[in-house]
Amino acid sequence: FANESLAAQAKLLVPEVADWDLRIGGLHEALPEADVAIASSGTVTLECAWFRVPTVVLYKTSWITYLLGRLFVKVKHIAMPNVLAGREVFPEFIQRDANEVNLAREANRFLDDPGRRLELREELDVIADSLGGRGAAGRAAESVGRLLKN
């Protein structure tokens, strides 16, 4: 979690979270050890993919922002790894669907099925490799730009 407040909220909303090993900050130290992540859509989803962490993605915003986005932005996915793969690799939950029941269910599906985690990590190898070394951010931005133009 980014801060103690978010961790406390998660514990209140999802009772199962109280039993999980939660970390505050230190993302790059925590991700290599993580079995699963729940992340808000943004660059953190790409970091999760880079570290091969199965991730459940959520996106919540004001309804007006959401509706305007739906009108003007035509993409099938919101998580960068899904955009790069051209399909859903990380499960995504948007607006009302981004609720504690759906997020916990998907996170537990990853936790309960080591085979599913391994399969996903192999898919994430392909995504991470597509980012390459130096200049990767530029290549990722170009890929997204091409998708937005289409």
Predicted regions and their residues:
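Nucleotide-activated sugar donor-binding and catalytic core shared by glycosyltransferases
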Residues: 1-150
